[in-house]
Amino acid sequence: MNRKDSKRKSHQECPVKTGGRGRPRQARRHKTCPSPREISKVMASMALGMLNEGGCSEDELLEKCIQSFDSAGSLRRGDHVLNMVLAMHSWVLPSAHFAARLLTLYQEATGSTQELRRLQICHLVRYWLTQHPETMHQDPQLEEVIGRFWATVEQEGNSVQQSLGDFSSRLSPGGPGPPHPMSSPGLGKKRKVSLLFDHLETGELAEHLTYLEFRSFQAITPQDLRDYVLQGSVRGCPTLEGSVGLSNSVSRWVQVMVLSRPGPAQRAQVLDKFIQVAQKLLQLHNFNTLMAVTGGLCHSAISRLKDSHAHLSPDSTKALLELTELLAAHNNYARYRRTWAGCMDFRLPVLGVHLKDLVALNEAQPDRLPDGRLHLPKLNSLYLRLQELAALQQQHPPGNASEDLLHLLTLSLDLFYTEDEIYELSYAREPRCPKSLPPSPFKAPLVVEWAPGVTPKPDTVTLGRHVEQLVESVFKNYDPDGRGTISQEDFERLSGNFPFACHGLHPPPCQGSGSFSREELTGYLLRASAICSKLGLAFLHTFQEVTFRKPTFCNSCSGFLWGVTKQGYRCRDCGLCCHRHCRDQVKVECKKRPGAKGDASPPEAPVPPTPVPQASCGSEDNLSYTLSLEPETGCHVRHAWTQTESPHPSWEPETVPLPAKASPPTESSKLNS
């Protein structure tokens, strides 16, 4: 290396040039325009500078708002400060107290020289109710103070002031509202719109999930966000709790749909389909549902399924890893934030991340300065973030939604399983291997349930409405001739949309014709949904009081069935035996025998061995499901997707099954007859 090359190399390795006094020179932006967010921040800071450098008192803030109006009700200058005060005052001052101060100022403004001031106060109150009508409806105390204010205006004000208090002038804009779903095909059309999960296109499923997500996100009000930030919980905020519950329901629905398949290859097909759905959600910029779907796919109960993941293609595995990296919590969701900032069209945020930002901003700065004045920069920062979320609620999702598919998804998401049940099903599908397994290629599970414990369950009325909507959609598309029935083949396919809810609950065909009526399908879905949603109705066993000819033990308490006749109960389908007082506490699912008859077998007929609670077993074996949880074997297994086994011939709609919870499976057994 010669001397010239050495100098050139030393210049290349030289650090960034520094300015005077050893300070690094800041990078300059050449020929670039500021972003809209930067412009809004500068405008807001300029407006705040007109008030005070760091803050102002409550009286000064009220005076500034009053002076924003002229005699005609027009704004004299920009409305940023006014809107910020009206939207954010409730964070530091109750709205009823704020309105009471305005009432006091109105009463103190007496004399002919104060008519303009009174008129300005009336314009301020009217503007407040026009721009923020929800505040009065959600605060009874504020509504009472506002009523006293307008009553005072009616008594002491002039005709112009009284006209502002007219009820017709108090507008109540409700926003654009949720998008209108696309109308379903009419009865006269001779084609079917598929309501089957296997037939749904990934893009179609992603669009409908986006519609449900946007409808839930659009219902959240600024008051809900304020209550969450100040209280630290979604309790007491129905709309926010519903949004959180929807995300958690989608995540668990993904897990249950994967685990509903009996074989590894079939589970891999569902995994691959949901990976494609996640990619479509990313294209739609629906990050909240994307977080839920990806979180469900990366949940440890799913990622541990080595045999199932072995059937995935390398491209699918790579796509899942990329989605996991995108939504990972590393560096405060840095990759998600960069992707979010680059989205310009329709987009839905990860609500938990943005609520976390609001909480951090609220906790980082005080509400008031040491001298008692309000800290306006903090209120303005919170206001700007709330405005960003409010602007997102004015969007319109791309595409149209089918009302029928929305009914199907709504009822599917109503079905609820606990975390323990999902884990137990995962271990039942692929039991633990005693040999050491290679480490999982997936990252740590995403934190999807940012509000743990939020698992809203639909009440009976809501569930019934969802079922009626779905039945209407089913007959609209699968009975175009209006005969009032659907075929058994269509019913078998439809039942596969609901993981585990339909297992063992197939009603008899209508009048033996091999078809199902509207009433039968409604009753079937109500029972299946109630079972899966844990609303108090259980179906696992069909017990019948019998007389045992040989010593028999109770499956629930392991006690002996004493007596001469009718010592206990036996399930007509699986042969499980128990005491009269134990039949409501049986915790073993009903596994129907291939040769089970509808009527009870003779008392002297042999009964398969009934297991008793084992002494010791891992927690992963404590099964509590309404379907067979046996690992994959060569035996015949009924499957809700493939419908490989015909419906049970002895199902009786008038029979009310007795509640029975699930219990740990056992290895030891005792003979009973």
UniProtKB/Swiss-Prot annotation:
Zn finger (Phorbol-ester/DAG-type) start-end: 540-590
Domain annotation EF-hand: ranges: 466-501
GO CC terms, sorted: cytoplasmic side of plasma membrane; cytosol; plasma membrane
Basic residues bias: start-end ranges: 1-10, 20-32
Cellular compartments annotated: Cytoplasm; Cell membrane
Biased composition (Pro residues): 603-612
InterPro entries with a match to the protein in the record: C1-like_sf, DAG/PE-bd, EF_hand_dom, PE/DAG-bd, Ras-like_GEF, Ras-like_Gua-exchang_fac_N, Ras_GEF_dom_sf, RASGEF_cat_dom
Domain N-terminal Ras-GEF: residue ranges: 49-172
Gene Ontology molecular function terms on file: calcium ion binding; diacylglycerol binding; guanyl-nucleotide exchange factor activity; zinc ion binding
CDD domains named among the record's database cross-references: C1_RASGRP4, RasGEF, REM
Domain Ras-GEF: 201-432
Swiss-Prot/TrEMBL GO biological process terms: antibacterial innate immune response; cell differentiation; phospholipase C-activating G protein-coupled receptor signaling pathway; positive regulation of natural killer cell mediated immunity; Ras protein signal transduction
Coiled-coil positions: none
Keywords linked to the UniProt accession: Calcium, Cell membrane, Cytoplasm, Differentiation, Guanine-nucleotide releasing factor, Lipid-binding, Membrane, Metal-binding, Zinc, Zinc-finger
SUPFAM superfamilies the record matches: Cysteine-rich domain, Ras GEF
Pfam families, alphabetized: C1_1, RasGEF
Region (Disordered) location: 1-34, 162-188, 593-618, 638-673
Domain remark from Swiss-Prot or TrEMBL: The phorbol-ester/DAG-type zinc finger mediates the binding and the functional activation by DAG.
Family: Belongs to the RASGRP family.
Role summary: Functions as a cation- and diacylglycerol (DAG)-regulated nucleotide exchange factor activating Ras through the exchange of bound GDP for GTP. In neutrophils, participates in a phospholipase C-activating N-formyl peptide-activated GPCR (G protein-coupled receptor) signaling pathway by promoting Ras-mediated activation of PIK3CG/PI3Kgamma to promote neutrophil functional responses.
Protein name: RAS guanyl-releasing protein 4
Organism whose genome encodes this protein: Bos taurus
